[in-house]
């Protein structure tokens, strides 16, 4: 099992380039199911979740060529000959975003069979909002043997109001509505940049969508969509992780190929902590000198403080002078990294959805265990400032969403090495069709 060995104490210095957003690439790949024509996606990150999505689409009969190593990380998908409209449990259990194929499949082929995702390390992410929305669009939904089965001759436009904000639910039903008969109005939609990026791709494919970037989307269905070429937005969570790495280690970093407008809540919070931030076009410079001030962070849907940055911010809070309070409002059970940070010397008390972090505490290297993607990132950050050597086990979690993170950190001066093989041959990201 892969591990990271990190020796802390080195300020990070230099430039780092952010990869494409995994959470934008996954729905974009699913959107290729909506057309018989090729869809070309650029800036696709080389991470495990993309490999899983490729395997899922190929199992349905799609041709997928992951062009890593080529210009712009260009990926081509062609779903002309779909032979098996099913997402198996073996694939869905490793990546819950696999359920994003439900809407596109039933919209284009009239049927879909998608495994229920089961449990999740960071709490419930129910698929019921997807199901209720598809039923509103006229799909007949049944559940059998752990699978959701959807059928429809052609979906019909309707008025959908989400009971709670859901990113994947918004994306799934948005894709389905593009091929529905008539007009669909969706209210209380997620406004994350990744949702907006998907909408822009769909418009390039011929979809008619109004209200992009707002909480109300109006979709006028069309008979068919065509191929398109699209560049995936930069990964705001990777950018935020490196920005915190610079602040935490007392470094001076230029985080390049990012969109500062997607980072507003995080950058504002870090400035409260005393971190110097300079945004310029597609880059953010982070400088940290002297004492970090404590601060409180409460996760919210976009444009609020992102839940996917909560664990990383907690690592920063351990090095702030005073008490910080971190509140997790999106998911339950998303403080699993806290006990591992405590093993390294952090002073953290959990009270329900609140974590009280008292700093500044010296951290020391220890053997720790990663429980999920963002928890992995928080442990890497803590290890960068810990005295001595930290061994992080189960780093396959971090490989799901960060492209070659150890290489990028080494390029900034960090002492980090991997034990194990990043992409075993059976999971090779090399171009396959």
Curated annotation (Swiss-Prot):
It comes from Koribacter versatilis (strain Ellin345). NCBIfam families: murA, PRK09369.1. Keywords: Cell cycle, Cell division, Cell shape, Cell wall biogenesis/degradation, Cytoplasm, Peptidoglycan synthesis, Pyruvate, Transferase. Disulfide bonds: none annotated. Cell wall formation. Adds enolpyruvyl to UDP-N-acetylglucosamine. It is found in: Cytoplasm. This is UDP-N-acetylglucosamine 1-carboxyvinyltransferase. Pfam families: EPSP_synthase. PANTHER family: UDP-N-ACETYLGLUCOSAMINE 1-CARBOXYVINYLTRANSFERASE (PTHR43783:SF1). Phosphoenolpyruvate binds at residues 22-23. Belongs to the EPSP synthase family. MurA subfamily. UDP-N-acetyl-alpha-D-glucosamine binds at residues 96, 125-129, 308, 330. It comes from the Bacteria. InterPro entries: Enolpyruvate_Tfrase_dom, Enolpyruvate_Tfrase_sf, MurA_subfamily, RNA3'P_cycl/enolpyr_Trfase_a/b, UDP_GlcNAc_COvinyl_MurA. GO terms for cellular component: cytoplasm.
């Amino acid at each position: 099992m892969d591990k990271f060995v990190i020796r802390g104490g080195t300020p990070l210095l230099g430039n780092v380039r952010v990869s494409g957003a995994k959470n934008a690439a996954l729905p974009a790949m699913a959107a290729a199911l909506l057309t018989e024509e090729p869809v070309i996606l650029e800036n696709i990150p080389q991470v495990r979740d993309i490999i899983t999505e490729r395997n899922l689409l190929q199992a349905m009969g799609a041709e997928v060529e992951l062009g890593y190593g080529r210009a712009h990380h260009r990926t081509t998908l062609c779903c002309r000959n779909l032979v098996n409209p099913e997402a198996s449990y073996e694939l869905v259990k490793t990546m819950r975003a696999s359920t994003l194929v439900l809407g596109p499949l039933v919209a284009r082929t009239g049927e879909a069979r998608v495994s229920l995702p089961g449990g999740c390390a960071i709490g419930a992410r129910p698929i019921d909002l997807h199901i209720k929305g598809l039923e509103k669009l006229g799909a007949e939904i049944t559940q059998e043997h752990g699978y959701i089965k959807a059928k429809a001759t052609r979906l019909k436009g309707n008025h959908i109001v989400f009971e709670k904000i859901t990113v994947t639910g918004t994306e799934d039903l948005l894709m389905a509505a593009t091929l529905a008969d008539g007009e669909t109005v969706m209210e209380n939609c997620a406004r994350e940049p990744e949702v907006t990026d998907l909408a822009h791709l769909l418009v390039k494919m011929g979809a008619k969508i109004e209200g992009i970037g707002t909480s109300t989307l109006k979709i006028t269905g069309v008979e068919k969509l065509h191929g398109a070429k699209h560049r995936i937005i930069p990964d705001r969570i990777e950018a935020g992780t490196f920005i915190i790495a610079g602040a935490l280690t007392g470094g001076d970093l230029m985080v390049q190929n990012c969109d500062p407008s997607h980072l507003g809540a995080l950058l504002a919070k870090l400035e409260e902590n005393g971190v110097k931030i300079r945004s310029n076009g597609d880059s953010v410079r982070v400088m940290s000198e002297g004492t970090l001030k404590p601060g409180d962070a409460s996760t919210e849907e976009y444009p609020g403080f992102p839940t996917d940055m909560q664990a990383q911010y907690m690592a920063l809070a351990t090095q702030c002078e005073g008490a910080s309070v971190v509140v997790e409002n999106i998911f339950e059970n998303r403080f699993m990294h806290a006990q591992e940070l405590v093993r390294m010397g952090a002073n953290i008390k959990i009270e329900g959805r609140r974590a009280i972090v008292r700093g500044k505490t010296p951290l020391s290297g220890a053997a720790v265990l990663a429980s999920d993607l963002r928890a992995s990132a928080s442990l890497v950050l803590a290890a960068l400032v810990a005295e001595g050597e930290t061994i992080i086990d189960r780093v396959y979690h971090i490989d799901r969403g960060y492209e070659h993170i150890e290489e990028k950190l080494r390029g900034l001066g960090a002492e980090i090495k991997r034990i194990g093989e990043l992409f075993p041959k059976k999971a090779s990201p090399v171009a396959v069709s």
